[in-house]
Amino acid sequence: MSKLIVLCPNPFRDTGLELTLRAKKLLEDNGYETRICPVFGANDKKAIPHGVTITPWSEVSSEAYLFIVIGGDGTILHTARYLNHASAPMLGINLGTKGFMAPLEPENIDLIVNAANGDFVPSERMMLDVELIRNGKVIYSDCGLNDVVIHGMGDCIKLTAWADGDKIVSFSGDGIIVATPTGSTGYSMSAGGPIVEPEAKNFILTPICAHVMGAKTFVLAPNRKITVKAERIHDRKAFVSVDGTNGVELVNDDIVVVRQSQKTANLVHMGLSSFYDSTFDKLLYKNR
């Protein structure tokens, strides 16, 4: 039986699924079985060309040998959320802006055959589990690859954070980010946090526009239980969101708990450039 390769496009970036269908033909010409499972818009008749067969995630996630994600970093993050129970690796083809998590550009599409043959470099990534506790009860839980963000909507909010019960920081400001090493090159970096190697196992705790001089980023061990309490929201609006998804609104004294997940994201790259090359090119000097 041939190996199953699942193509996970964002049809709003891969217009008409042009690149996806090229990848499908390329793989099938080399003896691989393929399925198309869009991350967004699977039922959008305008986004999915007539005659293209779409397969539900539930029918492929446990059988796939490799997932090829076609889109931007957001597409990869959404795919990782779908696949946090699957062990097959995930390779990205960049159709976004920075494309920091996607090692291939469309002009490198022929390399997906190499990846299907097992010629790739694995990159296991830490994920995080999130719980929102209100009045002693868990009312929301999620799992993310990048970060959990607690943020106000235009007004300062009061937050206090602990690690295993020890207070780390307490401040008023726009919010706080708890990022994984993968997420360290995203919102956390923009808020002044450090860049951390993606295969590392750490939490990066970064205040957002803290109205106090001493609120700095902390890098914590992965076995820490991070607790953040929303202490003063009142009539302001504040939310918690995981990997940029729609946020859940917070109320006074809500508690957000973040732990290292037992699940991991199994990304791969093709050895075309190192993490440091990508950082230099895509984040530091590309647009200068």
Name these PLM-found stretches.
Residues 1-66, 78, 106-123, 132-139:
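ATP/NTP phosphate-donor binding region
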Residues 12, 73-75, 98, 182-184:
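Short glycine-rich anion-binding loops that position phosphate/pyrophosphate groups of nucleotides
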Residues 169-214:
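Gly/Ser/Thr-rich active-site loops/lids in small-molecule metabolic enzymes
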Residues 69-95, 103-105:
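Glycine-rich phosphate/dinucleotide-binding loop and adjoining beta-alpha-beta core of small-molecule
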Residues 7, 69, 178:
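Redox-cofactor binding/interface segments in oxidoreductases and associated redox assembly factors
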Residues 97-174:
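Catalytic core of DAGKc-family lipid kinases
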Residues 16-17, 74-79, 185-190:
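Short glycine/serine/threonine-rich phosphate/pyrophosphate-binding segments
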Residues 150, 163-167, 216-288:
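ATP/nucleoside-binding phosphotransfer catalytic cores, i.e., glycine-rich phosphate-binding loops
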